[in-house]
């Protein structure tokens, strides 16, 4: 089964000109969801992974399942103000303004190997911020993995230039 065929495209959402790649249609399909989780688990089985970090919010869904299958812990990276307790945060640029993601200050131990996972990579700002947080806590980013890559927006390229390995299960061009 082609997972790309299970991802719905919603034109002009959340604003005109955006092609929103909606994974809820993939997630509701039991075999499609299983295929995504299995493909990611297969890729990282045997690798040194101590934790899976998922980015809010769709990264939580697949990230937790992958962590479970790999037998490792799961750590959420959330938007500002959503985590209780001591957190470490990092601001990143948006098209207009900035946003912030946070992680618990005790979520990653020094020298842990971390798989960073999200549903989609566009410009790479959120993934870069999450990777920086992992490194500030002393962790090593094994790879930044995504269900969907949008190569026209340059996020994976940006992460690779910064020294991070990237992987996407499927790619969508702007014209698709």
UniProtKB/Swiss-Prot annotation:
Keyword Transferase in record = yes
What does the record give under GO molecular function? adenine phosphoribosyltransferase activity
Q: Which InterPro entries match?
A: Ade_phspho_trans, Adenine_PRTase, PRibTrfase_dom, PRTase-like
Query: Catalytic activity, per the record?
Result: AMP + diphosphate = 5-phospho-alpha-D-ribose 1-diphosphate + adenine
BP terms from Gene Ontology: adenine salvage; AMP salvage; purine ribonucleoside salvage
Q: Which residues form a coiled coil?
A: none
Q: Does the keyword Cytoplasm apply?
A: yes
What would be one Gene Ontology cellular-component term for the protein?
cytoplasm
Q: What does this protein do?
A: Catalyzes a salvage reaction resulting in the formation of AMP, that is energically less costly than de novo synthesis.
* Oligomeric and partner information: Homodimer.
Q: What is this protein called?
A: Adenine phosphoribosyltransferase
């Amino acid at each position: 089964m082609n997972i790309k065929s299970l991802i719905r495209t919603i034109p002009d959402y959340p604003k005109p000109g955006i092609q929103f790649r909606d994974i809820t249609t993939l997630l509701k399909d039991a075999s499609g969801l299983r295929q995504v989780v299995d493909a990611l688990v297969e890729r990282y089985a045997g690798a040194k992974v101590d934790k899976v970090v998922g980015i809010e919010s769709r990264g939580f869904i697949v990230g937790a399942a992958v962590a479970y299958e790999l037998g490792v812990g799961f750590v959420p990276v959330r938007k500002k103000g959503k985590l209780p307790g001591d957190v470490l945060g990092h601001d990143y640029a948006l098209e207009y303004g900035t946003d912030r993601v946070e992680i618990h200050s005790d979520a990653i131990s020094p020298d842990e190997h971390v798989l960073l996972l999200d549903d989609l990579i566009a410009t790479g700002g959120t993934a870069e911020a999450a990777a920086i947080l992992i490194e500030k806590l002393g962790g090593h980013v094994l790879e930044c993995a995504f269900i969907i890559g949008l190569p026209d927006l340059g996020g994976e390229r940006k992460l690779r230039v910064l020294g991070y390995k990237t992987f996407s299960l499927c790619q969508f061009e702007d014209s698709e």
